[in-house]
Amino acid sequence: MESEPLYKLKAEFFKTLAHPARIRILELLVERDRSVGELLSSDVGLESSNLSQQLGVLRRAGVVAARRDGNAMIYSIAAPDIAELLAVARKVLARVLSDRVAVLEDLRAGGSAT
């Protein structure tokens, strides 16, 4: 059986992350482990059923882990690398946005913005 090329696996991984709610969930879980109730009250912007669906996607991808604590399910990031990935994404985005602001400012000033 032929295995999937690594680039396809990477693309699937990034597709898992390609949803604003999932990114927000991960940002909250990087701070600390949380129950579904805590996530709902943390301005995730999702209804309970949609939150459960998004957590399921993240669990199946191995990005978050869950454990039972009494009646509550407690979610956490599955590996510290997830926190690093989010931090790198933030740095890249800040640089990209900074470059765009510089071009916009140049255009407003009447420059040639090359």
Curated annotation (Swiss-Prot):
Entry keyword set: DNA-binding, Transcription, Transcription regulation
SUPFAM superfamilies: Winged helix' DNA-binding domain
DNA-binding region extent: 37-60
Domain of life of the source: Bacteria
Domain HTH arsR-type: residue ranges: 2-97
Pfam assignment, any one: HTH_5
Keyword Isomerase assigned: no
Induction: A member of the dormancy regulon. Induced in response to reduced oxygen tension (hypoxia), low levels of nitric oxide (NO) and carbon monoxide (CO). It is hoped that this regulon will give insight into the latent, or dormant phase of infection.
GO cellular component: plasma membrane
Example GO molecular function: DNA binding
InterPro entries, per the entry: ArsR-like_HTH, HTH_ArsR_DNA-bd_dom, Metal_resp_trans_reg, WH-like_DNA-bd_sf, WH_DNA-bd_sf
Biotech / industrial applications: This protein serves as an immunogenic antigen, inducing gamma-interferon responses in whole-blood cultures from M.tuberculosis-exposed adults in Uganda, The Gambia and South Africa, indicating this might be a good vaccine candidate.
Name under which the protein is recorded: Uncharacterized HTH-type transcriptional regulator Rv0081
Species in which this protein is naturally found: Mycobacterium tuberculosis (strain ATCC 25618 / H37Rv)
